[in-house]
């Protein structure tokens, strides 16, 4: 019985297979007819594809001959979007240093009755310098003129097209929009003038302070900035002869080989000396040495210190002008070196006075930030460590000993720290 069922099953399978073959044979003419109808359409599609390829081949030489559209700048040099974003961020960071960072740092160190006027000084100085910088400051500091003074070619930024006006970086063929670089340098000028307030704190009338700021910005800051930082950019140094011509247009100290990565000379030495001169010319505050003049809010000073440290990353790392390894090492040194200086000041104060203080570590941190500024992009970790450690110790004695020995009243220790 099982054999019979197996035989019947095999016969059924053969029958199904035979029927399928018969259906395929019946459909074969239909498939052939359909393929015959589709063949003209396929041939037409192939012809269209070949025609398209010929058109592309004919257009290729024309595309190759067409000039490339400039990405940025009237000479077609490249402006990297990442660099632009980094520089605008750095500009905002440096703004944070002055308002409210420096304003709070200084306000906490004066007496209560002078706190608001001290904050007002920082804000008003920033506004005055910002306006003057756009009117004539940027043009004087960063255009070709003579080794000590630029020109007036960019007054009010007139004639500058935001789409094409560029400023050089430190890499050939890499540029920044001129308006971005102008704003970055504006924040440097503003904080430099504001720093001097530490030398005349609690002694200047508002009107006298404004007049002094305008005059000092014009006749002290701008020439120094031009002498140290102005040059034609790396693309001007194509040959030895071209390099000589470009060097002749550079600032006086730049020609002499001065290296100032982020403003050790232009910002800190400049403002520190000015603060000392102000302190000596104005004389001591009424009651100095007889009446207690302790800081009214060290907590406010500590908050200002934190904002200064935060903003200083834009100050130092932003001075690389590109988001490159130079910016990275400057960022590293600004953190590591500053911490070293704060610790060095604290340990020195602990040994000399018997206990550390919050005001002391805040001042040590600022001393470290100042010390690493000119070398931030030039030294490695070891260089940053020793530079800032020495600065923390030296500035401690400059503030606590040298000032009393020489007898000047530098209200907020601008000279001793900067």
Describe every region a protein language model picked out.
Residues 1-23:
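N-terminal export/membrane-targeting signals
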Residues 4-5, 23-417:
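Hydrophobic alpha-helical transmembrane bundles of multi-pass membrane proteins
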